[in-house]
Amino acid sequence: MTRTALYAGSFDPVTNGHLDVVRQACRLVDRLVIAIGVHPGKAPLFSAEERAALLTETCGPVAQAEGAALEIVTFNDLAVSAARRCGAAIFIRGLRDGTDLDYEMQLAGMNGAMAPEVQTVFLPASTQARPITATLVRQIAGMGGDVSPFVPAAVAARLRQRFAAHS
């Protein structure tokens, strides 16, 4: 039996924190589905297609090294619906701090009420990944700062290109 987990998020952009969670998750499951949330009304920096390509490029080798299959999908509805579609029995959620825990506990409770067959598993961020957020990465990159300590090299290059095009 294949153990499948869903890791949902915006991944705009993918960060070293996301890779940390992916690495940990791939040690626990046979198949990890990374689900990119696409929500009308939001204006992401990268399109869903660009985010999928960056996730494939950066997370693919991590999953392969850990012996897990990786799939990238998009969703525009509830994460529980995405989990059911891909046959996931586990929601993967990363935790950086107590603020994340409070929010994620509420989310886990709501998801558990809607999809009791899908268990939420919290993975603590490594010390190096704890301060990283995609929001801060976008802000730093947008102001011309060096984000290379916080994101994979391919993402840093795409951020430089994106913000160079806007200046």
Curated annotation (Swiss-Prot):
Site (Transition state stabilizer) residue list: 18
Gene Ontology MF annotations: ATP binding; pantetheine-phosphate adenylyltransferase activity
Signal peptide range in chain numbering: none
EC supergroup of this enzyme: transferase
Cofactor: Mg(2+)
A family per Pfam: CTP_transf_like
Any one annotated GO CC term: cytoplasm
Residues given in the record as substrate binding sites: 10, 42, 79, 93
GO BP, sorted A to Z: coenzyme A biosynthetic process
Catalytic activity, as annotated: (R)-4'-phosphopantetheine + ATP + H(+) = 3'-dephospho-CoA + diphosphate
Record-listed ATP binding positions: 10-11, 18, 94-96, 104, 129-135
Pathway the protein contributes to: Cofactor biosynthesis; coenzyme A biosynthesis; CoA from (R)-pantothenate: step 4/5
Annotated EC: 2.7.7.3
Keywords: ATP-binding, Coenzyme A biosynthesis, Cytoplasm, Magnesium, Nucleotide-binding, Nucleotidyltransferase, Transferase
InterPro entries: Cyt_trans-like, PPAT, Rossmann-like_a/b/a_fold
Compartment(s) of residence: Cytoplasm
Main function: Reversibly transfers an adenylyl group from ATP to 4'-phosphopantetheine, yielding dephospho-CoA (dPCoA) and pyrophosphate.
HAMAP family: PPAT_bact
UniProt record similarity statement: Belongs to the bacterial CoaD family.
Subunit structure of this chain's protein: Homohexamer.
Protein name in UniProt: Phosphopantetheine adenylyltransferase
